[in-house]
Amino acid sequence: MSIITFFQQLFAQPLTQKQIFAEDVSKINSLEKAIQQSELVVNYLLQEHYTPSISICVTKRGFPIWEHGYGYADIEQKVPVNTRETLYRIASVSKPLTGLSLTKMQEQGWIDWNCSLYDYVPYFPKKEYDFTVKQLAGHLAGIRAYKGKEVLLNRFMSIKEGIGVFSQDPLLFEPGTQYYYNSYDFNLVSLAMQEAKKEPFEWYVTHNVLEPLGMYHTFPDMGGLSPNQSIPYMTDKKKQFKRTSDVNNFFKLGGGGFLSTAYDVNLMGQAILGKAF
């Protein structure tokens, strides 16, 4: 389906940026008006950035006040978006989920994040400097980021096998001296957790974080297309939507490999903000 046809079906008239931001949002004093204005922004973003779908869940004091899906999870079949059931690749939003899990494991005494990674993963090739699990979680260890097409890998690898993608590379800097955001830090964090607890990382996350928080629609991305998952699209030179190439993100589960819904991610956010979990 062409992008033009898709958005003609979604919206009767195109919106301009001037129309969207004409109103002073500080003067909005009702939920209904706030949602109306927000929907203008959402619709503009859908058109401007050629986004097939958006799933939104907003809560206030722990209760949902706005849940809605826009666009289609499957364009050709016109499958609507359900905020509580439609799965998306949440990419690096997997990191705070791993962070919650690491904190829970630290509280339970299964791991000490101030210890060297090598206390838990002694088979990781030695580097010029030692570094701790905590430094990995804070992106302070000097591990490199993706190279080339590593982000598009489409073969199943376990978390342990996955560290082979970067294990032979040197550190970028002495740990603790610089900040460098990357996903491979969390490959090592999740592997350290797995070795410390002597059970699969995803099992621990499920039983100690997902289930207690009621995140029943959050799963590891095992490759392919899972039931209820929104189809990942890209656009070609002819402005046509087409399905992206398959990838398998399981090897980087802790840093960018979970599937989830808007509602579940909202539950995680509440747990982080509430500081009670």
Language-model-derived ranges and their functions:
Residues 15-27:
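Acidic/histidine-rich, surface-exposed loop or edge segments in extracytoplasmic proteins
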Residues 1-14:
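Bacterial Sec-dependent N-terminal signal peptides
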Residues 29-88, 112-115:
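Short, conserved catalytic-motif segment at the N-terminal edge
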Residues 74, 128-277:
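Short, surface-exposed loop or secondary-structure junction motifs
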Residues 34, 82, 90, 125, ...:
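Residue-level marker of regulatory loop/turn positions in helix-turn-helix DNA-binding domains and
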Residues 36, 42, 56, 62, ...:
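Active-site SXXK
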Residues 77, 85, 97, 103-122, ...:
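Short, well-structured active-site flanking segments
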Residues 25-30, 256:
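Short, low-complexity N-terminal intrinsically disordered segments enriched in polar/charged residues
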